[in-house]
């Protein structure tokens, strides 16, 4: 199906209905030729005449094997698609007074995210006067990064943005969700990891 779409994009041989073309190709003297002469040159080489730039004046045509040309175009499309792979960012939220159980629970999830190739955006959320403990939040995030050094590296050191102190980690090994540096802005998937709360009598809920 994709090959059919490619075929529709390019005119070849007798389908090229113009008076003259600019000819390029291997073992070809680049220049402007009447269409009849360009077709003859392609035929003598056992190749096809492929119009690669129809909007140029005159249109640019390449002398090449058409099937080889389609293969090259398909390969180029795959490479471009690979460069545009979305970067997945998973979010992990901490409180400034995070206990060891909560910390280890989220650390385990972060390891899994980095192993699958996702970036991890960890942050400490400061509620009300808890902003006074921002230094404690920074220490927590640096500890988090240190415990994950075998899985990811720090892309952004802890920085305070409003009520959140954020650190960004990127996987050490490329996974299915990672992308080359040339990729566009990452897509943030907000999967905030919180610690499961055990049920208590009266269904009381405890806050983090």
Curated annotation (Swiss-Prot):
Question: A Pfam family this protein belongs to?
Answer: IF3_C
Q: Where in the cell is it found?
A: Cytoplasm
What are the GO cellular component annotations?
cytosol; membrane
Which superkingdom, per the lineage? Bacteria
Q: Does the keyword Transit peptide apply?
A: no
- The protein's predominant localisation is cytoplasm
Gene Ontology MF term list: ribosome binding; translation initiation factor activity
User: Would the keyword Calcium turn up in this protein's UniProt record?
Assistant: no
- What PANTHER family does UniProt report for this protein, alphabetically? TRANSLATION INITIATION FACTOR IF-3, TRANSLATION INITIATION FACTOR IF-3, MITOCHONDRIAL
Subunit architecture: Monomer.
This chain belongs to the protein called Translation initiation factor IF-3
Organism encoding this protein? Parabacteroides distasonis (strain ATCC 8503 / DSM 20701 / CIP 104284 / JCM 5825 / NCTC 11152)
């Amino acid at each position: 199906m994709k090959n059919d779409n490619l075929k529709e994009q390019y005119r070849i041989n007798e389908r090229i209905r113009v008076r003259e073309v600019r000819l390029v190709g291997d073992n070809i003297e680049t220049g402007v030729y009447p269409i009849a002469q360009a077709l003859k040159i392609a035929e003598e080489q056992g190749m096809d005449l492929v119009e690669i730039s129809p909007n140029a004046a005159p249109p640019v045509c390449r002398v090449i094997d058409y099937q080889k040309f389609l293969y090259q175009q398909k390969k180029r499309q795959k490479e471009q698609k690979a460069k545009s792979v979305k970067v997945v960012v998973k979010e992990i939220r901490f409180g400034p007074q995070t206990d060891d159980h909560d910390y280890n629970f989220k650390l385990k999830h972060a390891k899994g995210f980095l192993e699958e190739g996702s970036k991890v955006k960890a942050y400490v959320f400061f509620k009300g006067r808890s902003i006074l403990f921002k230094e404690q939040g920074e220490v927590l995030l640096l500890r988090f990064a240190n415990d994950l050094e075998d899985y990811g590296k720090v892309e952004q050191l802890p920085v305070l943005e409003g009520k959140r102190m954020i650190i960004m980690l990127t996987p050490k090994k490329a996974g299915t969700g990672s992308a080359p540096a040339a990729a566009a802005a990452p897509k943030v998937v907000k999967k905030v990891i919180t610690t499961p709360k055990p049920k208590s009598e009266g269904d009381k809920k405890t806050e983090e």
